[in-house]
């Protein structure tokens, strides 16, 4: 993994971190979810610290919006694709052929697992260097501090339809420690929009953002 900028001392642990439970073998994937759990926490810590330093005058609400934009599954999947991580994931053919949201989540999970082994192999500084390299440019993006989607949708719904957004959980998939919620939102007579996330709140935010984008209230920048 040259793009991590780190020479791994424990290559076997790196291989385990990129082996999904669907891969063949009695012990395949036994560490994958544990590494993913740790990597999620390391990523959140480093990005939060990075944002505090970069935006010293930002309020907690703005920092939370920026953090969520940087650590959601879509952002992680894009970074994973950029560094060529999908080609290194060992998984069963049924998983490797996933499309849509499930493929996004697979790549995001693998990137979190990679961050965990960076931390375990080289300490916090190794993980921090990698995260700063790929997340810091994104932290300055114009859309990183976009207003809370649910709040903006509620205001727009009142003005456009004299209505209140109605959210509904359509599905909940995945293990208890890493669920995937799909939520739809309806505003008056407008067509509903859907969104997914690792929490009910994240899915509601994604659905609200999807409706705002579709109706032209937000642009795609």
UniProtKB/Swiss-Prot annotation:
Which ranges carry the RNase III domain? 1-123
Write down the species.
Mesorhizobium japonicum (strain LMG 29417 / CECT 9101 / MAFF 303099) (Mesorhizobium loti (strain MAFF 303099))
Give UniProt keywords alphabetically: Cytoplasm, Endonuclease, Hydrolase, Magnesium, Metal-binding, mRNA processing, Nuclease, RNA-binding, rRNA processing, rRNA-binding, tRNA processing
- Reaction equation(s) it catalyzes: Endonucleolytic cleavage to 5'-phosphomonoester
Q: Which cofactor is essential here? A: Mg(2+)
What broad taxonomic lineage does this protein's source fall under? Bacteria, Pseudomonadati, Pseudomonadota, Alphaproteobacteria, Hyphomicrobiales
Binding of Mg(2+) occurs at 36, 109, 112
- PANTHER family given for it? RIBONUCLEASE 3, RIBONUCLEASE III
Query: Which BP terms does GO give this entry?
Result: mRNA processing; regulation of gene expression; rRNA processing; tRNA processing
What protein am I looking at? Answer: Ribonuclease 3
Q: List S-S links within the chain.
A: none
């Amino acid at each position: 993994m040259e793009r991590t900028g780190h020479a791994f001392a424990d290559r076997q642990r790196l291989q385990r971190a990129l082996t999904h439970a669907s891969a063949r073998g009695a012990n395949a994937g036994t560490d994958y979810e544990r590494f993913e759990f740790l990597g999620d926490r390391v990523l959140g810590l480093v990005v939060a610290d990075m944002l505090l330093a970069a935006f010293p005058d930002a309020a907690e609400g703005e920092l939370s919006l920026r953090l969520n934009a940087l650590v959601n599954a879509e952002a992680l999947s894009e970074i994973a694709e950029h560094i060529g991580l999908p080609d290194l994931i060992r998984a069963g053919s049924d998983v490797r052929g996933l499309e849509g949201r499930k493929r996004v989540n697979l790549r995001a999970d693998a990137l979190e697992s990679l961050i965990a082994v960076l931390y375990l192999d080289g300490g916090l500084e190794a993980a921090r260097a990698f995260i700063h390299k790929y997340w810091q440019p994104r932290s300055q993006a114009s859309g990183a501090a976009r207003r809370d989607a649910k709040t903006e949708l509620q205001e727009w719904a009142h003005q456009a339809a004299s209505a209140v957004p109605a959210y509904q959980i359509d599905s909940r998939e995945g293990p208890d420690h890493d669920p995937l919620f799909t939520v739809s939102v309806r505003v008056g007579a407008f067509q509903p929009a859907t969104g997914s996330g690792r929490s009910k709140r994240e899915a509601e935010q994604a659905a609200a953002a999807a409706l705002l984008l579709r109706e032209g209230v937000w642009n795609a920048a």
